[in-house]
């Protein structure tokens, strides 16, 4: 199962290298609801509550890529969280566009790892990643999707308190 997931992630990365996304107008709340629905089962199995606070708004983007981006960020947040905790997906308009932020209250990421976490195959906690069938490709894929949308992932993390990952999609 781990090898299969890694193969699909590698194929996704290669495909993103070769094609430009077809941008359409994306509705933030519809995107967030779709991702939340697809996350429902894994969140409940982990005992982690997904909290949404997403303002109305729209922006240019490729919906399937943005779903993949948010799904992977939320799944990483879930994996870092304890049972009976929560993960938040926030979305709000800004003067420049639309900001998404995923917040967990998990272990946090060591400061020395923050510069490397979007590198393919890099894993902060290898034992947890193997248990969760991770291959170290999820954040590399997220980083690539963000860059294709003209933005970057911003990580703020405190050990023992959790992590916030945000990105802003410009109008």
Q: Model features per residue range: what roles?
A:
Residues 104:
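Acidic ATP/Mg2+-coordinating residue in the GHKL
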Residues 150-151:
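Conserved glycine-rich
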Residues 17-22, 54, 58-61:
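Conserved micro-motifs of the catalytic ATP-binding
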Residues 42-51:
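Short conserved segments within the C-terminal catalytic ATPase subdomain
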Residues 109-121:
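Short conserved segment of the HATPase_c
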Residues 84-96:
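Short beta-strand/loop element within the Bergerat-fold HATPase_c
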Residues 77-78:
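Short helix-loop "hinge" at the ATP-lid/N-box region of the Bergerat-fold HATPase_c
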